Amino acid sequence: MESFTRAELVAQRDGVWAVCGEVFEAYEKCRMEKGSDPELCLRESTAVVGCSQKVMREIVKNCQKELNESVKCIEENNMRTIPCEEENKAFNECFDKLVAPKFL
Amino acid sequence: MVGYRQKWVQDLPPAGGFPKLKYARTSTSPIPGAYIFAGVFSIMAVGTYIFFSDKVERNAREEEEKRRLSMILPILQAENDINFLASPHQNVYFTRWMPPQTGKRAAALLRDL
């Protein structure tokens, strides 16, 4: 399982929710219903990690430059995403053009 | 008899006498208290307005940041769950089950992902 930094995950939040939104909601619903024991929601958590990893792999393959710019901006602004709207817009354009057609 | 050569001059008031001293009270132009109160109040009102408008904007910004961060919480929590299950663990608490903090560890369940 590959690890990504918080800035990378936050930078691509809209993209990963567009693809894996249903899986995330199912996982959140399971955790809300069944409590904190991780074994009870193992299937959902595995699906969440698998889906996000898949999307991140495609993003790193196709939109590395835009992702790096977004991550650099977020890290320079103390993990704030609001000052990085321009970089995030460029990344979203790249995501919509190159990564989204493979999943949606 | 000492033979001083300097001619002594007595220190006397000037001819005609000293002018009168101005010892009467002189007050500045009076400013009414209401004017002072209004001025200070207006300054404080402006400052308070600036502070609260900036506070509202700051709170809105923080809420937006929190919302955006919460979008990635499923990923972080799922990774934490899988890392915890992939590590040797036992329940060491007697009150309720609480997941302990685990370091980064390769999850055996997703080794081929």
From Swiss-Prot, chain A:
A motif (Cx9C motif 2) lies at residues 41-51. Disulfide bonds join 20-51, 30-41, 63-94, 73-84. Residues 17-59, 60-102 form the CHCH domain. Belongs to the complex I NDUFA8 subunit family. Accessory subunit of the mitochondrial membrane respiratory chain NADH dehydrogenase (Complex I), that is believed not to be involved in catalysis. Complex I functions in the transfer of electrons from NADH to the respiratory chain. The immediate electron acceptor for the enzyme is believed to be ubiquinone. Its main location: mitochondrion. A motif (Cx9C motif 4) lies at residues 84-94. GO terms for biological process: mitochondrial electron transport, NADH to ubiquinone; negative regulation of DNA-templated transcription. SUPFAM superfamilies: Immunoglobulin. A motif (Cx9C motif 3) lies at residues 63-73. InterPro entries: Ig-like_dom_sf (IPR036179), NDUFA8 (IPR016680). It is a peripheral membrane protein. One of its GO terms (cellular component) is mitochondrial inner membrane. Keywords: Disulfide bond, Electron transport, Membrane, Mitochondrion, Mitochondrion inner membrane, Repeat, Respiratory chain, Transport. This is NADH dehydrogenase [ubiquinone] 1 alpha subcomplex subunit 8. It is found in: Mitochondrion inner membrane; Mitochondrion intermembrane space. A motif (Cx9C motif 1) lies at residues 20-30. Complex I is composed of about 45 different subunits.
From Swiss-Prot, chain B:
Signal peptide: none annotated. It is a single-pass membrane protein. It is found in: Mitochondrion inner membrane. Its main location: mitochondrion. It comes from the Eukaryota. Keywords: Electron transport, Membrane, Mitochondrion, Mitochondrion inner membrane, Respiratory chain, Transmembrane, Transmembrane helix, Transport. One of its GO terms (cellular component) is mitochondrial inner membrane. The keyword Cell inner membrane does not apply. The chain crosses the membrane at residues 31-51. Complex I is composed of about 45 different subunits. Belongs to the complex I NDUFA13 subunit family. PANTHER family: NADH DEHYDROGENASE [UBIQUINONE] 1 ALPHA SUBCOMPLEX SUBUNIT 13, NADH DEHYDROGENASE UBIQUINONE 1 ALPHA SUBCOMPLEX SUBUNIT 13. Accessory subunit of the mitochondrial membrane respiratory chain NADH dehydrogenase (Complex I), that is believed not to be involved in catalysis. Complex I functions in the transfer of electrons from NADH to the respiratory chain. The immediate electron acceptor for the enzyme is believed to be ubiquinone. This is NADH dehydrogenase [ubiquinone] 1 alpha subcomplex subunit 13. It comes from Dictyostelium discoideum.
